[in-house]
Amino acid sequence: MTTASVIGAGSWGTALATVLAQRGIEVKLWCRAPEQAAQMAASRENRRYLPGVTLGELITPTADLKATVQSGVILCVIPSAAMAEIADSLAKSQVPQDSILVSCTKGLERGTGRRMTEILSASLPDNPIAVLSGPNHAEEVGRQLATATVIGCNDQDIALRLQEIFTLPWFRTYTSEDVAGIELGGATKNVYAICAGISEGLGLGDNAKAALVTRGLAEMIRLGTNLGGAPETFQGLSGVGDLMVTCYSAHSRNNQVGRMLGEGKNIDAVLGSMTMVAEGVPNTVSFYEAARRAGINTPIIDQAYAVISGHKSPDIALNELLNRNPRPETDS
């Protein structure tokens, strides 16, 4: 394979383009804004979203979607709210039927609860679909720091092909057939990262943060298995691995959102101060809705939703979590 396309030139899309280029693959990196494509082509750097990382000569920034999609592998690295629009645009752009579509977006569709691969499959039913997810901060991948990730696909031959494409001495790739579990783990952890950030903003210590993250994992498994994921997947890189890096890293946008909420800022002010999308905010609403539809007990998601929607202050939400009726640890 000599060509690949990356739809979305944010920090993660740009970082993945550099991974592919290091494998000797020609990469078309699609930007929604023509001026961004021109800036990146001229400076060989994504100054807005991934400054300091040089774009190799095999990476071609472009704003021409139809020309971009004529590749063997197409990575979709866009905000979850835009996935349905992009999927429809890809279908209209006559994507080759043998092109492998890989979702690298962590979220659920608002209102429907559809996973990103389900959205892609609905618009492009004849194409093979996969997911790539794990504890992967773009800033570290761009600097070629040691990283591991998971590729999920129902077709293991395709998963193995993608594994080969994405493997570098410093970028280790595993495979899995549990597409749903991989996607659900990667999306739910964004909610718990906001909660971990709230605990920091409130000035609580490591004990409280560790409790939130651990109970968040239990809640992730409880909800995720009900929505179609395998329990063991949530114990892997795309589950607990991604949860840890997102809750504890300074790179985490969702953690930053939570920290500012805990410090007393309202959600509009928080989001207005950010240049990149924090998926945990729409994810919180989507998983709150999904849990209600499924009848699953999700006390942490419930309180996160109450804070984000402005119904409760962070300190009241935390107090209600701490003062739930006592129960065995293995109970929900």
Per-region residue spans from a language model:
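Rossmann-like NAD(P)(H) cofactor-binding subdomain of soluble oxidoreductases
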Residues: 55, 61-145, 162
